[in-house]
Amino acid sequence: MKFNRLLKLNEQITTHAIIENIQQKGRNYILTLKSIHLDSNSKETGTSEWSLFIRAEDSKLEKSNQQKDPKPKPKPKAPSEASTKQIIFSQDFHVPDGVTYKYAEASGDRNKIHIDPEYAKKAGLDGVIVHGLCTMAMAIEQITDNHLGGFPGTIKEVGLRFSSPVWPTDDLTVQGWKAEDEENSLLFEVNRSGGDTKVIKSGRLKFENEQHIGF
């Protein structure tokens, strides 16, 4: 996500998305989208790029005609990226109960896995899960308020990967360290507190300058 400016309260934003690529990965697909976000004067407020993993459902005929693949050997667990770096900030935060309903109204994303417990269970989940962008927003808020001097306008670009579902009432921890390959950039990840489950990984935040940086 790249940000040209801060958005105003109650501002009307229109998003146009185009498909840039569809890549097959096994029986599944990776869909790459690029979105442009425009204000009411058709001026660009920012852009975003998305990689979506789409699971393909195998037909009964295909399953009956193919042999099962041998069970793959488990890969050794890679160390947390943060564990190999010098942590310069670590901040805990709580995911409020009911946040999915508020975020659904604010964002317009009313996918039932976020607001309908029974539907979420039919989809194989234990209950409603938090929107990925909602989790991202809460994590970036912690970074901004506690480590960027409370100046969101200094953020110019954010990239990350959603790696595990987040549930209402979860306690999370965001950790960050300076990027060695780029100035005015920091890396971060978000873990479920008290465990080693990463819910956001490969996070990178680029900011305008270090004038207001609090570390």
Where are these regions (language model features)?
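HotDog/MaoC-like acyl-thioester-processing domains
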Residues: F3-Q91, V166-T169, T173-F215
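Hot-dog-fold acyl-thioester-processing enzymes
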Residues: S59-E62, P79-P152
